[in-house]
Amino acid sequence: MENIISQENLVYKKPTLMNNVPMHYCPGCSHGVVHKLVAEVIEEMGMEEKSVGVCPVGCAVFAYRYLDIDWQEAAHGRAPAVATGIKRLWPDRLVFTYQGDGDLACIGTCETIHALNRGENIVIIFINNAIYGMTGGQMAPTTLVGQKTSTCPYGRQPELHGYPLKITEMAAQLEGTCYVTRQSVETVGAIRKAFEASMAGKGSSLVEIVSTCNSGWKLSPVKANEWMKENMFKFYPKGDLKDTI
């Protein structure tokens, strides 16, 4: 029997929390990668039965289809308010929102800032791809200066459209936040750290994940990743902006 069965070191496996269903995201989209990272962290922490996610309006509106945990859908931009209610009702739960730049940094700016300022023990996962992906590639609050979209075809002009909103830098200045960081899709450690801080009752955490939208950017997945590294990271540098944990 020992000659037939050989011991192997497991390098990778699909998280058991990931449902076996096709994703609706465009090929090359970063959302699928981030979903996997979130699932891995929840499993590592043993919080499968005590996690509650709040879905946004936007490309990730169907996130509840893909991770086998409890979910609640929220009205556009209101995910932090919904998460606040859930966490106050069930303080022993790991409660997080999963939001894009339009949902969080435009229509949901009020709910986001005030939840963070109150120090609600929730985690906000913020996907920043600098464009509105679901509705056709319009300019977002985070669209870079000079970046072309369907609603600013000549590029974002500060004198006309204003400057890109650095919502994460704003969050770092608030008294209620304990951990604010900006990372990219290869950084799983930041998500776990934020989840652990939430469960310890240390305050609000915001994890921005700089991502791609190859469909909205009109680039191939490979070119989109290159563009992200060459342009996005210059204006949205990676790293911890606040850490009081």
Tell me what each language-model feature is.
Residues 2-3, 190-191, 197-245:
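Glycine/aspartate-rich loop-and-adjacent alpha/beta segment that forms the canonical ThDP
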Residues 6-7, 14-75:
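Active-site diphosphate/adenylate-binding microenvironment
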Residues 13, 140-201:
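Conserved thiamine diphosphate
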Residues 21, 47-51, 90-95, 117-123, ...:
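Short coil/turn connectors at secondary-structure junctions
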Residues 25-27, 97-99, 178-184, 206:
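Short catalytic-loop micro-motif centered on adjacent basic/acidic residues
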Residues 57-59, 129-131, 187, 210-216:
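Glycine-rich beta-alpha junction loops
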Residues 57-133:
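Thiamine diphosphate
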Residues 69-72, 115, 140-144, 198, ...:
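Short, hinge-like loop/turn segments at secondary-structure boundaries
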